[in-house]
């Protein structure tokens, strides 16, 4: 049996649907969770879906994924631009890591164009709104089945 795909969302994503919907869309994080669970289920895989505004909690979940996940999808949000500690945690993984962003950071402010997480990511999906998560699930599935 394939281990679940862990999906982690960083700070402020609990406000998805109400915070800057012109950038991040109108779907809530619960909507995203439902879509990810359905997409994964269609491939015979389950999802562990979590969100935290706290860097240390995200790092603990990355450590947990070392043993319990087949792949990790992470939307680090603002921590992608600032957290070397999160990068270091991700570098301990031997499973596929897919970095996921709702918007396209390369088309936004200069400070958003670099993410530390990308240095540990197998691949990046960005700019497709809530569908970025589903596309990341598909990418993860493809990598664990390869």
From Swiss-Prot:
PANTHER family: CATABOLIC 3-DEHYDROQUINASE. The keyword rRNA processing does not apply. GO terms for molecular function: 3-dehydroquinate dehydratase activity. Belongs to the type-II 3-dehydroquinase family. Keywords: Amino-acid biosynthesis, Aromatic amino acid biosynthesis, Lyase. NCBIfam families: aroQ, PRK05395.1-2, PRK05395.1-3, PRK05395.1-4. It comes from Caulobacter vibrioides (strain NA1000 / CB15N) (Caulobacter crescentus). It comes from the Bacteria. This is 3-dehydroquinate dehydratase.
